[in-house]
C-alpha cells in the first residue's frame, strides 16, 4: 500500500513544513486542492512544494475542465515535470468548490472526457484538436511523462476514468461494499477501452485520523463524508435509477445543507454536525490501528 496526503494551499510556512514531514514519514504523494476562491493558488504551492522536497510526488486532487483551460493545464504540468522529472502527477475531476463558489455546476462527463482527450496529446508533445483548431505546445519537444489521475464518485465518471486514466481516485468511502461497487464500474470502463483493469493504479480518497479515542478521531474526519455527500447528491439527482450501495444511500438520506464558504473540508463546520460516528466510519479511517 502506498500513502498520499492531501494539502490545502494556505499558510505557506506550515504547508512547506508539512510536506517535508510527509516525505520524511514515507508518504509517496502530496495532493493539493485546486479551489481558487477558497484557497491560494495551487500552481504556486505545487512549485514550492517540489522545490522544498526531494522525492515525494506532487499533484492536484483535483483540478477541473472549467476553471483551467487545457492548454494552461498542459503547459504548467509539462513545465513542472521538466524541472522535476518523475515527481509530477495531474489529478482531474469534474469540479466542486472551484466552480460551485462561482455559481456554476460541475463539468459534465462529456466535458471531462474531451478535456482529458485534449490533454493527452498536449502533454505528449503532439497536436490536439481544440474547438476545431489544431493546437500544440510549441516549446515542448518530448513527452515529460505526466500521469493523469481521474477522480470519480458516480458510475459514468468511474467508467470514464477506467477508460482513460493512468490512476483512478475513488471518492465513495472506505467500505468494501462501496469500493467493490466503484471498481466494478472502473473495470467496465477499462474493458470497453481494451484495457486490463488489473493494470490500473487505484487510490481511495478518505480522511484518516489515528488515535486511541475513536469518537474523537471520527469527529476530526467529519469533513470527508460531508463533502462526499455533495457528489452523492448530484449522482442521485442526475441519475434517479442509480444503483449506488446502501452506505452511500444512508449518507444521502442524512445529508443537510452545505456551505462552501464557511467550512469546505472543515470538520468543525456547522454543516457537519449531523454526521454520526457510524456514518463517518463509512468514509474515513478513524481510531486505533
Question: Can you say where each PLM-predicted feature lies in the sequence?
Answer:
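Active-site mouth loops of central-metabolism enzymes
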Residues: 1-13, 63-70, 142-153, 208-211, ...
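Conserved, mostly hydrophobic/aromatic
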Residues: 26, 49, 80, 119, ...
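Hydrophobic faces of well-ordered beta-strands that scaffold small-molecule active sites
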Residues: 3-7, 30-32, 57-61, 88-92, ...
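An alpha-helical appendage that flanks or caps ligand/catalytic pockets
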Residues: 105-139, 179, 184-289
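Acidic (Asp/Glu)-rich catalytic clusters
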Residues: 19-24, 46-57, 77-88, 162-163, ...
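Short, acidic/polar
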Residues: 11-22, 73-76, 152-160, 289
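Active-site-adjacent beta->alpha loops and helix N-cap segments on the catalytic face
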Residues: 38-47, 174-190
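N-terminal beta1-alpha1-beta2 module of alpha/beta enzyme domains
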Residues: 1-60, 146
Amino acid at each position: 500500500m502506498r500513502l498520499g496526503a492531501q494539502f490545502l494551499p494556505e499558510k505557506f510556512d506550515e504547508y512547506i513544513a508539512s510536506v517535508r514531514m510527509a516525505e520524511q514519514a514515507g508518504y509517496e504523494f502530496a495532493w493539493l486542492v485546486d479551489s481558487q476562491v477558497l484557497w491560494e493558488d495551487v500552481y504556486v504551492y505545487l512549485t514550492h512544494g517540489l522545490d522544498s522536497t526531494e522525492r515525494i510526488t506532487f499533484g492536484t486532487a483535483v483540478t477541473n475542465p472549467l476553471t483551467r483551460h487545457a492548454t494552461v493545464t498542459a503547459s504548467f504540468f509539462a513545465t513542472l515535470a521538466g524541472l522535476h522529472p518523475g515527481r509530477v502527477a495531474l489529478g482531474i475531476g469534474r469540479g466542486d468548490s472551484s466552480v460551485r463558489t462561482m455559481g456554476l455546476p460541475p463539468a459534465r462527463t462529456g466535458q471531462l472526457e474531451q478535456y482529458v482527450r485534449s490533454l493527452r496529446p498536449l502533454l505528449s508533445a503532439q497536436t490536439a484538436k481544440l474547438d476545431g483548431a489544431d493546437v500544440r505546445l510549441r516549446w515542448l519537444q518530448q513527452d515529460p511523462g505526466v500521469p493523469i489521475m481521474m477522480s470519480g464518485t458516480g458510475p459514468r465518471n468511474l467508467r470514464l476514468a477506467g477508460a482513460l486514466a493512468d490512476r483512478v481516485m475513488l471518492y465513495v468511502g472506505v467500505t468494501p461494499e462501496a469500493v467493490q461497487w466503484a471498481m466494478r464500474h472502473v473495470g467496465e470502463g477499462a474493458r470497453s477501452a481494451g484495457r486490463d483493469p488489473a493494470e490500473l493504479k487505484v487510490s481511495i480518497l478518505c480522511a484518516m485520523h489515528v488515535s486511541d479515542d475513536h469518537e474523537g478521531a471520527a469527529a476530526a474526519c467529519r469533513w470527508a463524508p460531508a463533502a462526499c455527500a455533495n457528489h452523492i447528491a448530484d449522482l442521485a439527482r442526475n441519475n434517479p435509477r442509480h444503483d449506488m450501495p446502501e452506505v452511500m444511500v444512508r449518507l444521502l438520506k442524512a445529508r443537510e445543507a452545505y456551505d462552501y464558504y464557511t467550512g469546505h473540508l472543515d470538520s468543525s463546520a456547522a454543516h457537519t454536525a449531523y454526521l454520526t460516528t457510524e456514518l463517518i466510519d463509512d468514509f474515513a479511517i478513524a481510531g486505533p490501528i
